[in-house]
Amino acid sequence: MVIAAAAPLTVMAGVAPLALAIGGVGAPVAYLAAGISFAVFAVAFMAMTRATGGKGAFYSYITLGLGRVAGLASGFLAVVSYNALQIGVYGLLAVQTHDAISRVLGVDIPWPVLALVAIAIVWFVGRRGIDVGARFLGVLLALETGILLVLAVAILVKGGAHGIEFSTFTPKAIFAPGMAGVLAFAFAAFMGFESTALYRSEARDPDRSIPRATYWAVGFMAIFYCFIVWAIVQAFGAAHVQQAAGDDVADLFFSAMTTYVGSWATDVMSLLIVTSALASQIAFHNAINRYTYALARDGALPRILDRTHPVYKSPSRAGNLQTILAAVVIAAFGLAGADPYYQLLLVLNTPGIVGIIALQVITSLAVVAYFVRKHYVRAERVGLIAGVLSTILLGLALLLLVANIKLLTNMGTAANAALVGSVGVVFLLGIGAALYFRARVPRTYARIGGLYDDPHASTER
């Protein structure tokens, strides 16, 4: 489910060409670098599951390590960031669906209609619980990774444009101008993998399955992304791939598919990109619902949202709210005549990506603070070291992302400042809410982070 959230086919066909256009043949290495950073973070992240039981993930972990004020602020930021990512991608999904239907059937359907249909499908699957959602996403994930592997194998079997070579992994390629900007895209490609912890209460044997799923997801994405992008370098040749990507960002993968596999595979890939984005939407919908449920359970949001479905046991009330919010935003953008890609996807996704990486940095700090405060330095030495390293690595990634934000938005300085600043505004609002609860509703404040049933939690923060 967490790999489906990252939408491998959408990330590769939709975003990797831009990474190649900016960074050239060294772009595949950026995905490995991001994967290594997230692997270190995953070690620290999983070290906290024993202390929190995985309830609320970022929300609980940060509360346990840095206190309830930071915890609630992070919980609010997580809900808003995931919603921004998920609702923004409906714009991309609508564009992809429109193009696929137009290419195959010759029918022109307005993008808001397609987005609203997708919202209904996501609501239906999410409502039926993790088992149905996981099986459905598993099928879609197999199809989208399968078509990418077909392309990569065909390229390698035919020897690429000028033979198979490995200049991608040379220092000249890795440290080429533009590679710092490529890292922003590479880190964004891993969005959602940390949501494994949100399913702890619904998983079988969570002490083993959750860490295993997290490490497997990070490792698979890092190697798979690097391999596929490297294969595209072979398809066009190291000397020409950057120019080819710059000239034809949208169709780079489709052109390679037509050349090395055939037009039939190109049609299949255009349809699977739609299902790839749909799978991502379902996975993010489920993550949002569980964050909302955790906050409502603790009284930080209306308690009506902590109700589960009587049959499927999914957080259905939270799912209903998320669905309504998505529909309202899509309708508003549609009525305003906004562009679904440049004005919906980019405007909403940018603060979402910044917010999630910021939360990962804060979580890394929380791991370090918790183990030091509880004197677990010796017992959790690996988790502590991983927390320090991931704070540094992800902190640098966040700085690179903000410094190169124009590559994601193609907007001016003022607009970019507003988008990045909105992340800070949400966090400050969360701090304000926590301070209000501490002063006026102490019982609710005591419940923040789910720490009211944790015998090891501090009651003073």
Spans of features found by a protein language model:
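Transmembrane helix-boundary motif of multi-pass solute transporters/channels
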Residues: 1-99, 196, 403-410, 414-425
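C-terminal membrane-solvent junction of multi-pass transporters and transport-like membrane proteins
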Residues: 1, 173, 305-309, 357-406
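TM-loop-TM module centered on a large, flexible mid-protein loop between adjacent transmembrane helices
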Residues: 60-61, 67, 99-103, 219-284, ...
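Terminal cytosolic tails of multi-pass membrane transporters
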Residues: 364-386, 407-461
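Helix-loop-helix junctions that connect adjacent transmembrane segments
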Residues: 27-28, 104-110, 138-270
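Membrane-interface "cap" regions at the ends of multi-pass membrane proteins
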Residues: 1-26, 39, 43, 163-172, ...
